[in-house]
């Protein structure tokens, strides 16, 4: 892993995840992304959040995946090298952040559904357009809220290399022990809803949606 390009005082705490981290089955990547840090440079400010909920999309054999229809101009990032941002616009009102997985030419990805805000919450509230001091749990829970709070758009971020420490958006490891993981069905889709491809940090209050009623605990690591 490479050091993130922040101030010297932060370099000891964050190491950017390399391409090899994402060059794997999305199910493995999804589990291992939990507990990692999403980082955004927003002007002179730094926004960070701990990843607490993601979903895996398996590519051509996954009916719910954008890649299942084959390569298009819109989803081309999913067919490219691993570790790149795939951003799409949905429901006419919000963006969603994904990261490509698997080797170049083989589609697969992870959707980021929720993070636990750590640093820069004042700027996140501004980007969301809601009053500072509003319910912090709802600030970044859900893919649309997360993207808005981190200033993520398709024009700005689609195709961005999330392993580049010179970038203004990347994912890093701060050395914290891996969390306990819960695996359940994906949310907000119409196809392949039974597939257990949603990964959640057990007991975290920043996870999106209602309290889980059907889930199986992942192995404590």
Go through each PLM region and give its residues.
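Conserved, well-structured core segments that form or line functional sites
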Residues: 6-221
